[in-house]
Amino acid sequence: MSFRCPVCSQELKKEEKIWVCPQGHTFDIAAKGYVNLLMSNSSGAKRHGDDRLMINARRDFLSKGFYEPLREAVYDALSADFPRDGTLLDAGCGECWYTSYFKSRLDESGLEPQVLGVDISKYALEKAPKNCGVERA
């Protein structure tokens, strides 16, 4: 899976501490492992996505199990035709509540997926590595 530069749409390549495109546009990888590809100047926003309060409220809600039947049903549909070395992209992964579950279940099935989670909330992405070892961007 590859990512595209939000400035020029060329392919980004991961280097040690940055993602860079052939035109030289660079995006720093944060100490916590994520990279922000949003163009704040063009959107007028300084912050994107859920804040810490929203993240904590969602975590509290999800911990009560209300969405576990939904998560299981989505996994059943996902795994029915998932290729052995397939790629799973969770767009809007948040803290990776679904992502970590899908990854562990696919791993248990011997499917060896490449799993990526993307989100616009830096606060969610800061928590994601604690939930599972997914690539973050």
Language model regions located:
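Short helix-loop-beta connector
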Residues: 80-87
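Class I SAM-dependent methyltransferase Rossmann-like catalytic core
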Residues: 51-70, 77
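Class I SAM-dependent methyltransferase SAM/SAH-binding core
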Residues: 87-89, 95-137
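Secondary-structure transition/hinge residues
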Residues: 66, 82, 107-110
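N-terminal auxiliary segments of SAM/dcSAM-dependent transferases
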Residues: 1-47
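Generic structural signal for well-ordered alpha-helical scaffold segments
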Residues: 75-79, 103
